[in-house]
Amino acid sequence: MYQEEIIKASKKIFNEFSDTCLQISDNKFFFQPAEKWSIAQNVDHITRSVKTTRLAYSLPKIVIRTLFGKANHPSITYEELVSKYKLKLEQGGKASGRYLPKTILSKKLFLIQKWQKENEKYLEAIELKWNDDLLDHYIAPHPLLGKLTLRELCYFTIYHTEHHLNIIKVRLTDQFN
């Protein structure tokens, strides 16, 4: 995917995620199933993920290169990144540390607006500071996948959002029907 396509795909999944969450009643949104995250906690997790990811696109390029180095491999495709992530999940990979959602005390609209603001900042940073060549040149660490090119990190963000959207849709179907 080129930068323009990444931005388009990101906006599409971000909007679908927001629209889905906005349609959920507060009771369902905050319902805490045993051993699982509530929908609100999924939103919090995704917001934390995008906020942290955004840093890689917001910092000066020299800082990114100094901290993490340069890519020593071409970017893999979106499909390859998704397969790699699914394999890590199958092997027991899961969120930890700063990516774990907190107990949610905020209002639904506040959480969704916070998510939307982080998305806007993330997309703005990519659009204004990164072209296709640069997305393949720089790398950043991912807690499960290791060092990714910034293009691969964009792919991850798209798929990660879709992954949690699917979790939410399944939860709505399975638990509330």
Region annotations inferred by a language model:
Residues 19-21, 53-71, 97-114:
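Charged, low-complexity, helix/coiled-coil-prone segments
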Residues 26-27, 95-103, 139-144:
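A short small-residue
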Residues 3, 9-11, 17-18, 120, ...:
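Mixed-charge, polar/low-complexity N-terminal
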Residues 28-83, 124-177:
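Short, contiguous alpha-helical
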Residues 1-36:
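An N-terminal domain-cap segment
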Residues 6-9, 13, 17, 49, ...:
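Alpha-helical packing segments of well-folded alpha/beta enzyme cores
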Residues 75-133:
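Acidic/histidine-rich alpha-helical segments that form the ligand environment
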